[in-house]
């Protein structure tokens, strides 16, 4: 799971630098594993045809649709709503089917990734944080010896020894 976090971060960095062709494979890997921002970015790349990736309306609406869950950031939800407003009524059922297929393959139930908007205490700025439900099951306290920049060896008397 941690390699996917690396792909999500690297893809995001390249995306922000507008290096879409380089970002795409990293974002796609993270998107397939359930990371909402990566899903939205893959959808946007398909929607706009960026970085040499051919425009693909079905893939664009599918990826942005799965990213636009209730707990997604407002920007993702609003972008999806804007896309849906441009869909002719005769194609709504087709679009619903595409989004349903993507949600069944890459949504929370399929990937085990849960996302929430979180805020730092005292701040009005929220960020979308996604975690795999089993991400920490196989880790122990020694794997998390630096949490929030503080060594657990400095703060946890159980780890100091006699």
Language model segments and positions:
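Short, low-complexity, Pro/Ser/Thr/Gly-rich segments in the mature regions of secreted, periplasmic
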Residues: 141-161
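TPR/TPR-like (Sel1-like) alpha-helical repeat modules
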Residues: 54-75, 81-82, 88, 93-106
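Hydrophobic face of amphipathic alpha-helices that form TPR/SEL1-like repeat modules
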Residues: 5-16, 41-48, 78-84
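Pro/Ala/Gly-rich low-complexity, hydrophilic intrinsically disordered segments
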Residues: 89-137, 141
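Consensus positions within tandem repeat domains that build extended binding/scaffold surfaces
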Residues: 35, 41-51, 64-65
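Repeat-mediated protein-protein interaction surfaces in helical alpha-solenoids
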Residues: 22-26
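Canonical positions in the second alpha-helix
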Residues: 29-30, 67
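Short helix-capping/linker turns of helical repeat alpha-solenoids
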Residues: 2-3, 7, 14, 18, ...
């Amino acid at each position: 799971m941690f390699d996917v976090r690396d792909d999500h971060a690297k893809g995001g960095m390249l995306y922000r630098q507008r290096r879409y062709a380089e970002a795409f494979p990293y974002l796609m890997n993270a998107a397939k594993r359930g990371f909402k921002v990566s899903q939205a970015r893959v959808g946007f790349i398909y929607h706009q045809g960026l970085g040499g990736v051919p425009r693909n309306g079905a893939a664009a609406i599918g990826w942005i649709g799965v990213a636009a869950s209730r707990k997604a950031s407002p920007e993702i939800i609003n972008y999806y709503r804007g896309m849906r407003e441009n869909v002719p009524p005769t194609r709504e059922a087709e679009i619903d089917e595409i989004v349903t297929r993507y949600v069944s393959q890459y949504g929370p139930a399929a990937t085990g990734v849960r996302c929430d908007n979180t805020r730092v205490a005292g701040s009005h700025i929220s960020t979308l944080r996604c975690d795999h439900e089993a991400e920490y099951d196989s880790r122990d306290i020694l794997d998390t010896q630096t949490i929030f920049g503080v060594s657990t060896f400095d703060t946890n008397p159980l780890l100091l020894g006699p």
